[in-house]
Amino acid sequence: MKTRILRYFKHLGLTILVLLLILIPVGISEGAQVSYGHDSASLNFDGEGPYVFYKNDSLVTVKYIRGNKDDGFAIDEKDFSVNQPIPAEVYFPLDQTKFNFTIPTSFETPRSIYRDNKKILAISDIESGFKTFRDFLIRNKVIDENLNWTFGENHLVLLGDFVDRGFSTTQVLWLIFKLEQEAKKQGGTVHFILGNHELKNMYGDHQAASLKYTFVASMLGKTQSELYSKDAVLGRWLSSKNVIESINGTLFVHGGLHPEIAALNMSIPQINAFMRKTYYEAPYPKVDEDKKEFLISSKTGICWYRGYFKEDLSQEEVEKPIKKFKANAVVVGHTLHFSVKKFFEGKVYGIDVKHSSDYHKNWPDYDSEGLLITNGNYYRAMADGTLKKL
């Protein structure tokens, strides 16, 4: 009897081992990770902010969270005229990083097409990871150690999904906001192209947001949707952004370009204008569906489409929208890859990779990557600042 029991557990152990040997590589190939070693600093709310809301046409209210769970929390708030510079400070609890800037309260819609032959550095799907975003920019000489813009007249393309999942959404967005202003002063450009997760936060789908922001909104006396509404500075700023841009002959979109876009009688600026009207609407099928509706669909839309990697597209189908917009290639995020890669004979570049998390360790862990385009050549931009030609 004892021998039979031992034999049973031996077979069971071998079966489990074999399953693990099969499942672990499969899981890793799909981007699965095991998280451990969570840092409690993620729940440090002291100094969280700023959260800036329009009080009326002439005033905004700036709010910060102060305190801790032992002594309680309070809101530090102050009103400012929309006509004066609004000083702001952002705090990152993990390593006590702080940065300062001023907040304007009105925003211009960016251009959709750029031609200047300057360098382009693109990165996507940071998902609220402030540290990995900051460190990548420092090592690739976009900013200095004090988080100041050093990329001159060049282009930094942020290809969507910089929010959700992590604990540093506020810090990430304000760093982008700050760099956008600094780049402009030097003749450079920060292109924040919206992804599906920015849109989700705007139309009220917060399932992928960290639970932290449920409490943040409650402390501020707001709902989570109000953090990015048209009555919030971050909301108005996001709503000014594009979903597609052409920079020096390369297209940038978060999801991808469905082949049917080639049949639409719409330019890139017209697509952005149409999409901008829908940012605060969840995508849903309509009875009297306009043929432009597939642009916002959660399957075929510009911010959602995964067809380059999930469908059996021909080279001709892939190239139709690229040729329509007189471009050489399209760069996309949204669909995860082990590294920045080119597809379809160099017509598609996928740049969504796994990035390290701010407040917990992962196994396996991954280094960030981006895409550098210069002099017509495409390179993997590595986390340590080195380049690898594609």
Task: Please identify what each model-predicted range represents.
Residues K2-L390:
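Feature recognizes metal-dependent phosphohydrolase scaffolds
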